[in-house]
């Protein structure tokens, strides 16, 4: 039997409800990023492959063309440094969205993320905020091997100062991403 979602959104079999659009998960993420970039000039998107012709599996498709290469840009393979760049930009008043396409390599960012970004608000009595969104894709296909397919949310959910969301529907993905960027 078909399972119909409770929320007013398309079901999982691609059938839309009357007067509803059908969006894929990557399309929902892309729409959220596009809206956030359009609403707030402090928002920028960085990460490996965000300006790729495939657009991070469609999640960032052509956003670099629409918003410009200064607001949506590719980064080198240097996770530790880039988390520091994102955290520093956030402390400086920007609203970075760091696309980290392999959660396994978030371990390389632990010092910047866990010892600094997540704790600065506590360390400075709420005077310093780090409005940083880290987007990590889990379970994006077969053949990812042991170091490219871990689900590490259990570790991150225990870090004070981090807010962890795991949207399971397109509707939630768009809404939670917009909320996280605005928070």
Residue ranges and their predicted role:
Residues 2-183:
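Thiamine diphosphate
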């Amino acid at each position: 039997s078909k399972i119909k979602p409770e929320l007013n959104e398309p079901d999982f079999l691609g059938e839309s409800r009357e007067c509803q659009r059908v969006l894929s998960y990557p399309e929902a993420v892309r729409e959220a990023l596009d809206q956030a970039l359009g609403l707030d000039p402090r928002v920028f998107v960085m990460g490996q492959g965000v300006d790729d012709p495939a657009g991070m599996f469609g999640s960032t498709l052509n956003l670099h063309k629409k918003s410009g290469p200064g607001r949506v840009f590719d980064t080198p393979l240097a996770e530790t440094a880039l988390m520091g760049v994102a955290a520093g930009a956030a402390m400086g008043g920007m609203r970075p969205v760091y696309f980290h396409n392999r959660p396994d390599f978030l371990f390389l960012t632990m010092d910047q993320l866990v010892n600094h970004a997540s704790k600065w608000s506590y360390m400075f009595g709420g005077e310093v905020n780090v409005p940083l969104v880290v987007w990590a894709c889990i379970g994006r296909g077969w053949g990812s091997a042991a170091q490219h397919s871990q689900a590490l949310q259990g570790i991150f959910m225990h870090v004070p100062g981090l807010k962890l969301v795991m949207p399971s529907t397109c509707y939630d993905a768009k809404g939670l991403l917009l909320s996280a960027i605005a928070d």
